[in-house]
Amino acid sequence: MIRVNDLNESLKFYCDALGMKLLRKHDYPNGEFTLAFVGYEDEDSHTVVELTHNWGTKSYDQGSAFGHLAVGVDDLYATCAALKEKGVKVVREPGPMKFGGPHIAFVEDPTGYKVELIQTNTVHS
């Protein structure tokens, strides 16, 4: 679960930019929060991301314990170019990892969380 500043902007990022689907969303008026679940496939058998928006909260201290989310992509360079066209902030340009390994890039969601993009055909087993 990640807490987001603006649920609509976050849904645009995860769904419109990264291509996830909004799987379900529910408002909890008594608790003054909304939960939205996004992912690439059905949540019964695939990983999903829970976005929590606490009504009236403008920002969060992200701390230092959480690093980032990671998503595999088929064409890292084309994906980054397309995300830039959509206004997504690329904070680490695509290229090989330091000291060898897969090709990666990092983008930033509207709340400031980092999402690592990993070119799947460069991952070594």
Region spans (language model):
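A general structural signal for stabilizing positions within well-ordered secondary structure
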Residues: 14, 60, 106-109
